[in-house]
Amino acid sequence: MASIVMKSQHSLGYPNIGNINRSDYDSYEQQYNNPTGSKQYNNNNNNNTNTNEINNGTNTNLNPNNMYGMYNNNNNNNNNNNNNNNNNNNNNNSNNNNNNNNNNNINNNNNNNNNNNNNNNNNNQHLSQSQQLSPTPYSSNSFSKLLSRSTNDLMLDQDDPSKKKRKRTSPDQLKLLEKIFMAHQHPNLNLRSQLAVELHMTARSVQIWFQNRRAKARNMEFKPQLSHGGSDLIYNALGSQNGMNSMGGGGGNGGGNGGGGMNGINNILNGNHNRNLNKYIPHGGNSINGNMGGGGGGGGGSHNHHHHNHNHNHHNHNHNHNHNQPLSNGDCGEKFSVASAWNKILLHPNNIDFLIRYNPDDPNSIDVNARDSKGLSLLFTAAFLGYEYQVRRLIESGANPNIKDNQGNTPLIAASVLGNQPIVELLLEHRADPNLVNDEGVSPLFSACKGGHLQIASSLLDHDAEVSVKTKINGETPLHIASLKGFEKICKLLIETEAKASVIDSNNRTPLHHACIMGYFSIAKLLICNGADMNAIDIDGHTPLHTSSLMGHDLITRLLLENGADPNIQDSEGYTPIHYAVRESRIETVKFLIKFNSKLNIKTKNGQNLIHLSVQFASLMMGQMIFESKGCEIAADDSDDQGYTPLYLAAKAGKTNFVKYLLSKGASKKIALEKLIQENQDKEIIQMLESTVTKSSNNNNSNSNINNINNINNINNINSQPNTNSDNNNNNNNNNFNENYSNGNNEQSQPPGNKFEEDDEDDFYDRVYKKSYTNRIISNSFSYQQKLNSGNGISVNSGNLED
């Protein structure tokens, strides 16, 4: 009797369906593919290879290639259907003849609408032959609901054009989608639309496919990083995910990848195995396909395209395609290794007992400690995949709990990095060493701390795991990685287990450096309370205060300053924490640092002070706050190593209001002008600065296009007398920036000739500001801008800016 291999619908770790006989298959077909339950057998055709059935007035002939009994039209039935009106015996003879002529058909539509009451289908009306029906199978959930409905109603439902029908993704579409997914896991709308047009799909279906594919990647293909800069040590060794996580079906006696693989192992148990097998690489060589899967006959004819298995069956003859290449070589070897293929078979609960039959003297028995070319063992794979029962049975069968792969990873590292706590406990109970590290120096405790697995870390520490072991790449300890990842409870656990809070890595960074970089206030507070060095200097000269000031973590900055951190330590570039805060325009951080006595006169290695940095990277408000702070002794004309003054940098950057403010602080335009001319800067800027130097107070008839504002006498008249003209009002707003350089006297301006002794002249303000936009925001202060627009202006008295 023919044997049909049912496709396993369970993945690794679940019971296998196994082989189903002819009678079992008929009952299966009756339950799932005949929802009306009116199945009859024709006793007059027992000599046929396949059973002939009358299903709701339809002659059926089951074929294993059609699991769901698709309905196919057969014109030969029409030759004898008219005889059904005579008597029941003639009808049976006609049906027998038709079934003998069409033995390979599955379900044939009966075109007779005039059957008498003696016919088997006296309660059903049939559709015409022109209505070709291909109903889809009904699930077991809807089986009970369909019992009370007629076949005709079910057929009409299938032909309903308004009913939504699922459209399967073709292998070609899957191939292209998978290729795009490997490059773009989150394609944008434009790319999804292009894919929809290219693949003849809807944009919504493409979006749903990528969502499902990302979910599959998260659940089944997650590749954990064991250390910073380390490769995917574990999963690269495991090989292809398709080979590890899928168990396809197969037709015939040899089986396919997975489902048929069980037949392969059964053949081994029954003694039908090759006597030339290698005991260290089980069933290697050319015989592996015959024993592990493929089509019928043990040769292997199953082609695994993603999750689709296609078995070739023509006229009830299995055509097997024998791939005589070992899985460890060629294209198959690139997808998954020999060990991974054996793992998915031998780790099945039904076959795990086979492992205890290992006999060193028997070349055909299996060595539980054998490894493939990548160093993979059964115990390592079981620990990685989370199979607790298999791990226990393997250890009981003599598997080494400390066995390593080619990268030095142990089963305990694999279980720790993925958070398989029961397996970690099981391995530790069987004397797995918690201090064994891989080739990069990663320990199980480091892996657990990186993944945030608190219970696993606690179990490892209870079994005397080394708390201060460092990695070989960057010398980090578990406390470093826990501080960087923000796992406060793990940090507390490590410190309670005598981990040093001031331990340094290969870059001289402490866990406090990591906490300050990432902004974890609670971890920083925990480390400081347990004696962390707040002035520790890393390889670049940075202290934790440098990093918190750079990142703008004000709470941590204040915490460090209140606990005695030094704000005046310079790094390798000469920067103090306040230099970084000014460069990143962190105004609140600068306030904290000034409050805790940060020195404002310190220069960087290239000679720049805080005003230089304010002009280049920050706003006018930052420069004002620094100039007006107590203890600021920065000169307005102070230059860096290249001879650049703040005024030169402000003019070059086009920061008009910064130029005005620096001039009000006594910055020399002559120095800036000489530098601009020397470097051949913008002619307009040079012309403006040059005109302010050479123009006298009596030059009211100048024809220069730039000098279009009244001289200093007219400006003083505008300030003292109201003017209703709109143009004069604009001049009034602009001239509110007129600064009086008399000794503390803000009521009366000095004569123009005495205001600037050599090189300064007031027309510069008007010319530059005249060319700027009237509503231009000149600082981050809202009140500053409001007063500027209202015409009240800003007056500067003896170097103090007053709103």
UniProtKB/Swiss-Prot annotation:
This is Homeobox protein Wariai. ANK repeats lie at residues 374-403, 407-436, 440-469, 474-503, 507-536, 540-569, 573-602, 606-636, 642-671. Residues 291-302 have a biased composition (Gly residues). Residues 42-124, 696-746 have a biased composition (Low complexity). Putative transcription factor, that seems to be involved in anterior-posterior patterning of the slug, probably by controlling the proportions of prestalk and prespore cells. CDD domains: homeodomain (cd00086). One of its GO terms (molecular function) is DNA binding. It holds the Pfam family Ank_4. Residues 23-41, 125-138 have a biased composition (Polar residues). It is found in: Nucleus. It comes from the Eukaryota. Residues 303-322 have a biased composition (Basic residues). Residues 162-221 bind DNA. Its main location: nucleus. Disruption phenotype: Cells show an approximately 2.5-fold increase in the number of pstO cells and the size of the pstO domain and a concomitant decrease in prespore cells and the size of the prespore domain.
